[in-house]
Amino acid sequence: MFSPVLFRFSKPNSFLVLLFFLSYIHFLPCAQSQREPCDTLFRCGDLTAGFPFWGVARPQPCGHPSLGLHCQKQTNSTSLIISSLMYRVLEVNTTTSTLKLVRQDFSGPFCSASFSGATLTPELFELLPDYKTLSAYYLCNPSLHYPAKFICPNKGVGSIHQDDLYHNHCGGIFNITVPIGYAPEEGALNVTNLESVLKKGFEVKLSIDERPCQECKTNGGICAYHVATPVCCKTNSSSEVNCTPMMPSGSSAHAGLSKKGKIGIGFASGFLGATLIGGCLLCIFIRRRKKLATQYTNKGLSTTTPYSSNYTMSNTPTSTTISGSNHSLVPSISNLGNGSVYSGIQVFSYEELEEATENFSKELGDGGFGTVYYGTLKDGRAVAVKRLFERSLKRVEQFKNEIDILKSLKHPNLVILYGCTTRHSRELLLVYEYISNGTLAEHLHGNQAQSRPICWPARLQIAIETASALSYLHASGIIHRDVKTTNILLDSNYQVKVADFGLSRLFPMDQTHISTAPQGTPGYVDPEYYQCYRLNEKSDVYSFGVVLSELISSKEAVDITRHRHDINLANMAISKIQNDAVHELADLSLGFARDPSVKKMMSSVAELAFRCLQQERDVRPSMDEIVEVLRVIQKDGISDSKDVVVEIDVNGGDDVGLLKHGVPPPLSPETDKTTASSSNTTASSF
């Protein structure tokens, strides 16, 4: 079986290695029968797997957190999630420590795949040399020539290539893994052949040393995991289980000790004994403090906590024990540290995140409520850690609010919340998946706008994915309340991840609005919400209209260097669109003047932005309607780009004919100028 050691060591003095591991030894009483589930193999159809995997009859502590296997009983197929993508496990070879995998979305037609990134976790998997990685581009400029060209509905023109050559001409890119001998065609891609190749899958080798677990089992132990640390659990004569971290291969405490090494061990043992005595005294002190705190609480002096009371706290100030029981080694191993779970998310200690972020040294950015840092967890996951500015009652409420909202939401375009700290932590920290490509704002008018500009097809796809996420939130009774381009993150494939739910509100389904003091970012705040203190989902629609205007123009929402009437982009957009001057708003580098299909799509999106930015919220479209309209615009644009014909517009007109493409433009300049001019369309300059 596979046996992991995730931490690789050089060859230090043996007594230092022993000291390191002695300091992590824990005595964990548990029944003999609790070992049995980790003796059980994962079985699904013809596939079996043991340590370091878990799943079905093997509880999570029996394997690495990232190696959970799922059995589809209807098809007897096994699946594994890697970097948020679902893979089918075709084979597990325990002799060579290899797996054969195929992406779940490649089981059907290629054009129906998710077109999202496929990055293997390097700490766990190594691609075998018989395979290679190719780049698949999509939403490409249709007027250029590409090798291995393909066209997919809603994804436009695409190409398969081994090098990163077309990122400036295409809206999206993702990786595919193929045999080393596969070569895509020079002309049109043979999609049927590619589908056949992808369905056969590829092989990876686990980047794990199996020898420590073999040694553990030879000595009568059971291999398990605490978070991402492999442990060996043994039963003593009193039927109690001791779990200790497994030592790396080649660093045995008994191999080749010199006289100085033995003296060092004696010194280390004495030091460890003194440390244990000090620890006992510290525990007594902490118990006394907790007892006093309980007395204060009983007198009505309790403090606000960031969580509801459906779980209980353990005796240690940085770990959480969830009420209820788990079978197998779960209760025992969870006591080793802070791997507990609150409402489906992991609870971290402050020290664990301090280590993951290298003492909060890698700042990614900051917002109105906290600074965000880059970090790497022990299991290899890259994370973004939000550190709230202060621990006031308001910050605690925002902390709790973001957890309550994100813990129950699952959507491909919403950022994933991995976990948080406890109320006992020195600081309130939230842990999210790390999104590598920055914010949409950086790509539109920030430091990446010149080096890697986003082409129009990709911008339209970003608008669709953002609208889809907001539509999902509204259907779930949630108003984001801070929709802006700095809260729209992009991964390496330019897939959207909407973030920052500190201001979001749960919206009662039986009410038309809720009354609350206006909050948000200048330039994005709904003027009716600002004036009347009445919040509903149409407030997000207004903010999204500003985002659409940024996608069209590449301009910031507020810019005091512009003419005073155009400082607020919402005002500028309304004025330009109403006066039939979209060309003065549009970023001409996107092809508005030279590509008829791009001009048509950008003009249609401008019409939609115009509707979203109306002063009267009742005439704004819903997010559901916005998603539908954007998809129609994209579909029509792709249809037009399949047969590009360059025409010279001798009249210089900008008429696009929106109605025949299903985009109802109320108050639009062409369909009803009289109505538009009589309406109050002046957006707030807030």
Curated annotation (Swiss-Prot):
GO terms for molecular function: ATP binding; polysaccharide binding; protein serine kinase activity; protein serine/threonine kinase activity. The modification Phosphotyrosine is found at Y432, Y529. SMART domains: S_TKc. Its EC number is 2.7.11.1. Residues 286-686 are cytoplasmic. The active site is at D482 (proton acceptor). Keywords: ATP-binding, Cell membrane, Glycoprotein, Kinase, Membrane, Nucleotide-binding, Phosphoprotein, Receptor, Serine/threonine-protein kinase, Signal, Transferase, Transmembrane, Transmembrane helix. It is a single-pass type I membrane protein. It is an enzyme of class 2 (transferase). The modification Phosphoserine is found at S515. SUPFAM superfamilies: Protein kinase-like (PK-like) (SSF56112). Residues 34-264 are extracellular. This is LEAF RUST 10 DISEASE-RESISTANCE LOCUS RECEPTOR-LIKE PROTEIN KINASE-like 1.3.
